Amino acid sequence: MLIFFQNLESQEVNGYDLVEIEGVSTVVVESESFRENRASYCKQRSNPNEVIWAEEFSSGKLDKEIWDYDVSNGFYDKGKFVYGWGNSELQYYRKGKTDQNTNENLFIENGLLKIQPIHHRRAFQKEFDYTSARIKTRNLKQFTYPSKITFCFKAPTGTGAWPAFWLMPEENIAWPQGGEIDIMEAKGRLTNIAGSAIHFGEGFHNKDEIVQNVVIPPSVRFQEKFHSITMEWREDSIQIFLDSESKPYMTVKSDDEVFSKFSYPFNRNYYLIINVAVGGKYDDHRINRTAFCLNSKCSNKDNPDDHRFLIDWIEYARLEP
């Protein structure tokens, strides 16, 4: 589904038009670079002297010293298992099982990390119709401020696909007291919209969030071209940028009014998570079963990569305070 924004009533923020699409505040980005037909609109890489760590996916192996897998369809909270990861998600996340530390749902090919949800005709473990992959750097690689985190990606198409690139606190702390930073998440149903969000508060039923989407022209949609999203992270502030844009489409500061009720939790160490969920609350449980791969080769699709979350590179670099 394409969203056309030319005739939407708008306001302005940071020089961008601000509209509301499906009830969500959405920044309209019409970059000069979009006038050129490119395979990738990702920003230029940082000066090597500024780079703390980078992931190029240049070998076929997922580095076990950096990446670990989440496995299952949920988690334990106070001794009780929470199915669907708290979001009514349908997929079962599988572990790496080869010498390459990959599996049918996650592999590295041609310098790209590829994550593909698979719809199983016979339920996986007799219970789950979908499998996928979710990797994390917890206890292996930490991220903190002042820094900038950038990743270059192409989103998967298909209603029900939910790719995400996000941060959670390294310490053991009840969600969302330590905060959650969703640098990028997208709905497979919406081809030219991606979003960012932060979550914070005292508990599951006593919390708040800030959500900001970004919409781009149909000619450069997130599901057909590579784009980058960068989070610039300083003490007491977060700014998020699309591609090579000099202005952020999302800005959060500790003195924003929303933090008068809940404390600002984002001055701490976090770990990185990359995953593709299936279904769930994010797109109101919408799902199109025919949109998904049916096997590891995705042989039921003419262009398998269209149905995979593709990541070209990740960069973690120094930033002046």
Region locations from a protein language model:
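Classical Sec-dependent N-terminal signal peptides that target proteins to the secretory pathway
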Residues: 1-10
